[in-house]
Amino acid sequence: PQECNEKGIPEPEFAAKILAEFSQPNTCVMGYNNIRYDDEMTRYTFYRNFIDPYEYSWKNGNSRWDLLDLVRACYALRPEGINWAYDDDGMPSFRLEKLTKANGIEHENAHDAMADVYATIAMAKLIKEKQPKLFQFFFEHRGKKEIEKLIDTAEMTPLVHVSGMLGNYRGNCAWVAPLAWHPTNQNAVIVCDLSGDIDNLLSKSAVDLRQDLYTKKSELEERGVSS
């Protein structure tokens, strides 16, 4: 507290300075896991100080992008040219400090704000150099409108989905079929993971599927139902 009082500035002033930087027209805010963490902290800070928490990321041609998802996609789809890091169980690790070390990128004081900034920039440059087409594709499709053009729920055209929710053991990657747009959230689409057993999805009624959805996994396994 003493150091903050001596060197810091009031939070409303701090939030205004961040807003000014993030609101420069036609810029993209990028980080490493920023969409799930840093951006949420930014939004909370803006909201707490009576600033629109979303406007900075879309107004005046602005956007946001998360390098972590690009790194995961690079590992799963175009791994050549990057030295990948693994944990003790042999699973791929996407921790920034491990990847920078594996690729000879200086990253002292990991999790120090500025050190992480320079490390993130270096990893982005590395992927752009080694896999330029992948980098460009993901950059051009960082926005919702571009992604919507790829989604065909009428034909349920399969898509490659990359997400940390899928797990490192499967490269955070899976084929999915878009089934329908979410009824209440226009930014979400309901998909089917095609890497699993979809027989139940094809043969059961909506009522039975709903019951299975809220049944314990152990009970489903006892009945021989795959989840």
Task: Describe each PLM feature range.
Residues 140-220:
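Acidic catalytic cores of enzymes that act on phosphate-bearing nucleotides/polynucleotides
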Residues 8-9, 21-22, 42-44, 168-171:
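A short linear-motif detector with a strong N-terminal bias
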Residues 10-12, 25, 53, 79, ...:
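Proline-rich intrinsically disordered, low-complexity coils
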Residues 224-227:
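Short, intrinsically disordered, charge-balanced linker/junction segments flanking boundaries
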Residues 6-17:
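Glycine-rich, highly charged phosphate/nucleotide-binding loops
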Residues 1-2, 22-132, 138-141:
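Metal-dependent phosphoesterase core characteristic of DEDDh/y 3'-5' exonuclease domains
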